[in-house]
């Protein structure tokens, strides 16, 4: 059983430099089971660079990473996957010409004893996971290029969850989606929370953060401005943190 008093993830005093410039400067953030933490800041604030230490895309030059209380080393995306960390990029990394099941198992196909693709098993497993995440999803027999933005997000999320993700990194999951599709993704995120996953949400839209997240961590110029529970702050407070680099709750 998951211990909710121990963070799923703790990034402690993480620092990364590029060409002598501190992209991330001693930043600490954490994430608990069943929680969504939004990461905000202008382009170049350091939020994506910070989270790429967790996904294995970058290596921190200083700091520590703890997963469920245990110190770990993440040198590459394979190390991240070994820690049940999955990333859903804005591009979704889906193969447009393949259907949902083929995308879900892309690179991790189920093979029969005879050495052939077990397409019926893969479709059955896809239907099972989609029934859990998005019961309204019915388009199993068409290429994902024919799906709406929200349906494509469903496939990308299902792929991560099927392969036992405990920690999900989502890069602007509602970008370029209409209101109805955005609501679909919001419902998916709520379902993932119920199942105990922890989600880091990289976002530019403050309204989405206030709606989808439990806490918001704001960065500016590579430093952490602050982390606040969204129910304790206003959108203007968050905007002030992004623009001014100061937390209105810090007096003096």
Model-derived features with residue positions:
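Glycine-rich phosphate-binding loops of nucleotide-dependent enzymes
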Residues: 2-252
């Amino acid at each position: 059983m998951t211990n909710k008093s121990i963070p799923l993830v703790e990034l402690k005093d993480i620092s990364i430099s590029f060409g002598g410039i501190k992209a991330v400067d001693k930043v600490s953030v954490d994430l608990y089971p069943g929680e969504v933490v939004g990461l905000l800041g202008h382009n170049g604030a350091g939020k994506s660079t910070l989270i790429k230490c967790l996904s294995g895309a970058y290596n921190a030059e200083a700091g520590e990473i703890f997963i469920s209380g245990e110190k770990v080393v993440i040198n590459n995306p394979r190390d991240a996957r070994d820690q049940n960390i999955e990333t859903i990029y804005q591009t979704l990394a889906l193969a447009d010409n393949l259907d949902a099941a083929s995308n879900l198992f892309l690179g991790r196909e189920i093979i029969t004893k005879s050495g052939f693709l077990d397409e019926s098993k893969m479709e059955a497993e896809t239907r099972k996971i989609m029934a859990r995440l998005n019961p309204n999803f019915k388009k199993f027999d068409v290429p994902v290029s024919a799906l709406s933005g929200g349906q494509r997000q469903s496939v990308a999320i299902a792929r991560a969850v099927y392969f036992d993700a405990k920690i999900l990194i989502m890069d602007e999951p509602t970008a370029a989606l209409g209101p109805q599709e955005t609501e679909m993704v919001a419902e998916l995120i709520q379902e993932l929370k119920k199942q105990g996953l922890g989600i880091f949400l990289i976002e530019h839209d403050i309204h989405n953060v206030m709606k989808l997240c439990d806490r918001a961590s704001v960065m500016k110029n590579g430093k952490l401005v602050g982390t606040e529970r969204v129910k304790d702050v206003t959108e203007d407070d968050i905007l002030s943190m992004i623009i001014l680099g100061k937390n209105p709750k810090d007096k003096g």
